[in-house]
Amino acid sequence: MGKKILVQRAGRGGSQFRSPSWRRIAPLRYVQFSEEQLKTTIRGIIKELVHVTGLNAPAMHVVLENGEEMYLPAVEGVYVGKIIEFGPDAKVEPGNVMPIGKIPEGTMVCNIEKRVGDGGKYARSSGTYGVVMIHRDSTTLVQLPSGRMIEVDSRARATIGIVAGGGRIEKPFVKAGNKYHRARTKAWKYPKVRGKAMSAYAHPHGGGSHQQGGTPVKKNAPPGQKVGFYGSKCTGRGCVRWRAQQAKTQQRQQA
């Protein structure tokens, strides 16, 4: 009896295929401020720069003057002990958090909120940033790292600067063990085995005395879906002789 292939098992979403988010220190997001706090400048200090399992960029642990704590994606140029400002009147410096409507046009920002108060959704991966393009009445046009333009509420918060850890993908893994540990933090399955290298019960392309290329079209597909040789007993010049012999045999039997 056959088995479900790996892709089908992953599609079900069992525990083996879920990203182990419980290993992370905390979610990287802005804390919720009251309406009064949003109008003033709140200061905080970076206590430490930490690595969060499963994330591409380092994180900074920020403690506010009112005692609240949060973890945010670290930006280039910050350091332990740096004072971080939150508010519309904050200085335009790396690490400070401001409403995107108060940030000058052309400024590079990261951890941009999609909706006001959601904690940050855009430009959070290592080395990424968005660019403030145009301010309008109540919205701001932002260019994302992909080049796509989006319009967000001018009250949405963003961090000044570029997310730290740029150039991460330029460093080679070198060893398969490094790639294994990388995949384990994301619940990826590594190494990835080819279907035709498996046994027949494990994959439709598996089995046989030697590896053969599979086909994406099943044998019982309708005629319009099959083009070329699908399920043919033989092909080539030898097949012509074989069919001629079969035709002669049928004629003798009919005679």
Curated annotation (Swiss-Prot):
Coiled coil ranges: none
Keyword hit for RNA-binding: yes
Residue ranges of the TM segments: none
SUPFAM superfamilies: Nucleic acid-binding proteins (SSF50249), Translation proteins SH3-like domain (SSF50104)
GO terms of molecular function: rRNA binding; structural constituent of ribosome
Source organism, top-level taxon: Archaea
Pfam families reported in the protein's UniProt record: Ribosomal_L2, Ribosomal_L2_C
SMART domains cross-referenced by the UniProt entry: Ribosomal_L2, Ribosomal_L2_C
Keywords: Ribonucleoprotein, Ribosomal protein, RNA-binding, rRNA-binding
A cellular component annotation (GO) from this entry: cytosolic large ribosomal subunit
Disordered: annotated span: 201-229
GO biological process: cytoplasmic translation
PANTHER family xref list: LARGE RIBOSOMAL SUBUNIT PROTEIN UL2, RIBOSOMAL PROTEIN L2
Family recorded in the similarity comment: Belongs to the universal ribosomal protein uL2 family.
Protein's job: One of the primary rRNA binding proteins. Required for association of the 30S and 50S subunits to form the 70S ribosome, for tRNA binding and peptide bond formation. It has been suggested to have peptidyltransferase activity; this is somewhat controversial. Makes several contacts with the 16S rRNA in the 70S ribosome.
Quaternary assembly: Part of the 50S ribosomal subunit. Forms a bridge to the 30S subunit in the 70S ribosome.
Protein name: Large ribosomal subunit protein uL2
Biological source species: Caldivirga maquilingensis (strain ATCC 700844 / DSM 13496 / JCM 10307 / IC-167)
Gene name of the record: rpl2
